[in-house]
UniProtKB/Swiss-Prot annotation:
UniProt xrefs under InterPro entries: C4_dicarb_transport (IPR023954), Na-dicarboxylate_symporter (IPR001991), Na-dicarboxylate_symporter_CS (IPR018107), Na:dicarbo_symporter_sf (IPR036458)
Residue ranges crossing the lipid bilayer per the database entry: 19-39, 55-75, 90-110, 155-175, 199-219, 232-252, 343-363, 366-386
A molecular function (GO) term: succinate transmembrane transporter activity
Topology relative to the membrane: Multi-pass membrane protein
Originating species: Rhodospirillum rubrum (strain ATCC 11170 / ATH 1.1.1 / DSM 467 / LMG 4362 / NCIMB 8255 / S1)
Family: Belongs to the dicarboxylate/amino acid:cation symporter (DAACS) (TC 2.A.23) family.
Protein name stated in the entry: C4-dicarboxylate transport protein
Lineage: Bacteria, Pseudomonadati, Pseudomonadota, Alphaproteobacteria, Rhodospirillales
Family matches, as Gene3D superfamilies: Sodium:dicarboxylate symporter
């Protein structure tokens, strides 16, 4: 017997200050300090964070398209695409619903809004008018219809993840079905994907600057002190999200044969980037590359990760039920079990109908409350000031949930190289090239 070990070029050790996650961490701390002591200057640095997010969004569509097309085109069994998508949706719906239920249970146990005694009539509904108007524009049917792009060009021009994914899946299937005639196209797309991933690496060099600007703006504009009045809600949300990640996702990871803590260490650069920018999209391209390096088949990564960004928003779901019950408790509205079940059912639907929108968490909450008559939509004004501080936690939880989901679905489908995963999670991931592009050496095993 023999096994194959990926060969990698020797790597020159980086000095600690050259490591990306160290640079991002320093940038976050510097942004907090600047925003706190010089709030006007901090607020003025918003363009740094915005520019970095735009740079990342510029390359998301090409990464998704090329990853999905080359992954699907390399399959010989087209039914496998349907199986992967079906298993991913089962996972997404199960854990998204569980996240909603956990948020509701914690809110009923902790009562973060009790004692505030807010009169609903005193709330300023105009403060959340922008979000509620966006919420009314969203519907489940409209969301599903919007997945189909008007043209392939419009999908790339708008940067809509699901539209690009939809076109990429169809293109990949078509390319696979033409057989040898499609090989020249595939031979062009594979090296092009490597060029795009190199572009990702170049863009990531600006990550510390983006994280610095985004964090300086957040602290400068809203101030750390703005958290104090609603500290119970913020603290409860962070603790609940931590419970979901380390207990629920930790058990899922353990059951499927890998360590959650090891996975978090493996994607630590991406986690710090998400923390600094409050955007899980900022780290989408590098997450896809790392999961492929860790042994997940390209076709699975290309389908599960982009879909999860719209259907597997665990952090957003926890936030929705927790925030809705907080508003009810703060305004002394007693929700019956029937009211809470209605809230849960509406949230299950609206979390899909408003997915993928900028500020999705707050807009989705508005969409939910506009349907549930018991909780005043104007109550969202209570949490408007601290929502920005909860967005980091939402983004981190969503991001970790999608990383775990991809590995689990790959394992279910038999498309996970466990040896590569073990090596990556032990710290050897950076020495691995993606499966389709690595050189290999043949080592005889002991008899």
């Amino acid at each position: 017997m023999a096994f194959v070990v990926p060969a990698a070029p020797p790597r020159t050790p980086h000095k600690f200050y050259q490591i990306l996650y160290v640079q991002v961490l320093v940038a976050i701390v510097a942004g907090v300090l600047l925003g706190h002591f010089y709030p006007d200057l901090g607020s003025a640095l918003k363009p740094l964070g915005d520019a970095f997010i735009k740079l990342v969004k510029m390359i998301i569509a090409p990464v998704i398209f090329l990853t999905v097309v080359t992954g699907i085109a390399g399959l010989t069994d087209m039914q496998k695409v349907g199986r992967v998508a079906g298993k991913a949706m089962i996972y997404f719906l199960s854990f998204s619903t569980l996240a909603l239920i956990i948020g509701m249970i914690v809110a009923n146990v902790v009562h973060p809004g009790s004692g505030l005694n807010i009169d609903p009539a005193s709330l300023d509904a105009k403060a959340v008018q922008t979000y509620t108007s966006h919420a009314h524009d969203q519907s489940l049917v409209g969301f599903l219809m919007n997945i189909i792009p008007s043209t392939p060009i419009s999908a790339f021009a708008s940067g809509d993840i699901l539209q690009v994914l939809f076109f990429a899946v169809l293109f990949g299937i078509a390319l696979a079905t033409v057989g040898e005639r499609g090989k020249p196209v595939l031979d062009l797309l594979n090296p092009l994907l490597q060029v795009v991933f190199r572009l990702v690496a170049i863009v990531m060099k600006a990550a510390p600057l983006g994280a610095f600007g985004a964090m300086a703006f957040t602290i400068g504009k809203y101030g750390i002190g703005s958290i104090a009045n609603l500290a119970m809600l913020v603290g409860t949300f962070y603790l609940t999200s931590g419970l979901f990640v380390f207990v629920v996702l930790g058990l899922v990871a353990r059951y499927n044969g890998f360590s959650l803590l090891a996975l978090l260490r493996y994607i630590k650069e991406e986690l710090l980037l998400v923390l600094g920018t409050s955007s899980s999209e900022a780290a989408l391209p590098t997450l896809m590359e790392k999961l492929e390096r860790a042994g997940c088949k390209k076709s699975v990564v290309g389908l599960v990760v982009p879909t999860g960004y719209s259907f597997n928003l665990d952090g957003t779901n926890i936030y929705m039920t927790l925030a809705a019950l907080f508003i009810a408790q703060a305004t002394n509205i007693d929700l019956s079990l029937q009211d809470q079940i209605l809230l849960l059912l509406v949230a299950m639907l609206s979390s899909k109908g408003a997915a993928g929108i900028t500020g999705a968490g707050f807009i989705t909450l508005a969409a939910t409350l506009s349907v549930v008559p018991s909780v005043p939509v104007a109550g969202m004004a209570l949490i408007l000031g601290v929502d920005r501080f909860m967005s980091e936690c939402r983004a981190l939880t969503n991001f970790i949930g999608n990383a775990v989901a991809t590995i689990v679905v790959a394992k279910w489908e038999g498309e996970l190289d466990r040896d590569r995963l073990a090596l990556a999670l032990k710290g050897g991931g950076k020495a691995l090239l993606p499966l389709e592009h690595e050189a290999a050496i043949h080592i005889p095993s002991k008899v």
